[in-house]
Amino acid sequence: MYNPRCKDLDRDYFPSYHTTRFQDQPEPNLAVLEHFVRVTKQHGRELTEKQGITVDHLRYGEGRQLVDVFYSEKTTNQAPLFVFVHGGYWQEMDMSMSCSIVGPLVRRGYRVAVMDYNLCPQVTLEQLMTQFTHFLNWIFDYTEMTKVSSLTFAGHSAGAHLLAQILMRPNVITAQRSKMVWALIFLCGVYDLRELSNLESVNPKNILGLNERNIESVSPMLWEYTDVTVWNSTKIYVVAAEHDSTTFIEQSRHYADVLRKKGYKASFTLFKGYDHFDIIEETAIDDSDVSRFLRNIEIE
């Protein structure tokens, strides 16, 4: 267990129960979720309505396999590309709640790609991971076609889990492609699915399609990372929020250790004051701690 003192795994794997905000509300865990949905959707609307940012609506597959690419009239053709993968335990959320991070990045000269994906139980987690591999191939084709100068990827929560596949797909991410990747940012992710596979709160009626046969193959913490040297020029940041559960924090800490021991340039950061949700909400604020962190990655 990542939290040996835990007496309620369902609660430890449910991030909204660990916020210190909205304590004046009858159910803070619901209030933090409602606030997240409302604020992040507002951030998305304001990009085009108030900030003069342009968006191209693209597709990499069927169903919800969509990509929105944001930029401004000042964005150069060779601008670096920042790719964001949303969370939601592979079964919730969508692109409309995934654009908080866009504004400050576009103002700093980036193009920003926000991707969506098919959700469980319409697909199993194994199928979703295969579809995400198709997305990786698509986004690298896009960068090569548009002459992008460099890439940074960030995934939040379940999106961080999906993003981990980039390190395990040498047939898609060639050595030449990996050299384009400036940084990988794993935000508040879950990387070992063994504990949560039987939790009704996270995997009701096994909508993720987990079993003894596939549990290790869908758990990045347990993978054998062998193609490490092609990532020598890429920095990896594994990030946790102070007001997330002990299980989430320790999964992130342990995942950073796993990557370092394999030879990746990986670091672990615990963000003080943030919970699982406002660490994303505040990416919309140019001078927030998390925005400064993202800005510093550019120059490290």
From Swiss-Prot:
Offer one Pfam family short name for this entry. Answer: Abhydrolase_3
Q: Which reaction does it catalyse?
A: N-formyl-L-kynurenine + H2O = L-kynurenine + formate + H(+)
Name the EC number(s).
3.5.1.9
Transmembrane intervals? none
| Pathway this chain belongs to | Amino-acid degradation; L-tryptophan degradation via kynurenine pathway; L-kynurenine from L-tryptophan: step 2/2
What are the protein's UniProt keywords? Answer: Hydrolase, Tryptophan catabolism
- Domain comment, as recorded: The main chain amide nitrogen atoms of the second glycine and its adjacent residue in the HGGXW motif define the oxyanion hole, and stabilize the oxyanion that forms during the nucleophilic attack by the catalytic serine during substrate cleavage.
Q: What is this protein called?
A: Kynurenine formamidase
Q: Which species is the source of this protein?
A: Drosophila melanogaster (Fruit fly)
The UniProt gene name for this protein comes to: KFase
